[in-house]
From Swiss-Prot:
SUPFAM superfamilies: beta-beta-alpha zinc fingers. The keyword Cell cycle does not apply. One of its GO terms (molecular function) is DNA-binding transcription factor activity, RNA polymerase II-specific. This is Protein krueppel. A zinc finger (C2H2-type) spans 1-4, 10-32, 38-60, 66-74. The gene is Kr. Pfam families: zf-C2H2. It comes from Musca domestica. Gene3D superfamilies: Classic Zinc Finger. PANTHER family: MYONEURIN, ZINC FINGER PROTEIN. Belongs to the krueppel C2H2-type zinc-finger protein family. GO terms for biological process: segmentation.
């Protein structure tokens, strides 16, 4: 497993950053190309990674999943 060997065979041709997985390189390349394939259905925002879209959607749903340990506020 590459995780423990430190092997990073996938290199970005633009900035030479290296990755352990080809799909990590593919996602990284979007930073250079400007591709943002994930679109918010509520507004005009677009995102490189689906996780960022999911986090953004909380703006529209009002979901606040994290609680403050000091005041119990969200």
């Amino acid at each position: 497993e590459r995780t423990h060997t430190g092997e990073k065979p996938f290199e970005c041709p633009e900035c030479h950053k290296r990755f352990t997985r080809d799909h990590h390189l593919k996602t990284h390349m979007r930073l250079h190309t400007g591709e943002k394939p994930y679109h918010c259905s509520h507004c005009d925002r677009q995102f490189v990674q689906v996780a960022n879209l999911r986090r953004h959607l909380r703006v529209h749903t009002g979901e606040k999943p994290y609680t403050c340990e000091i005041c119990d506020g969200k």
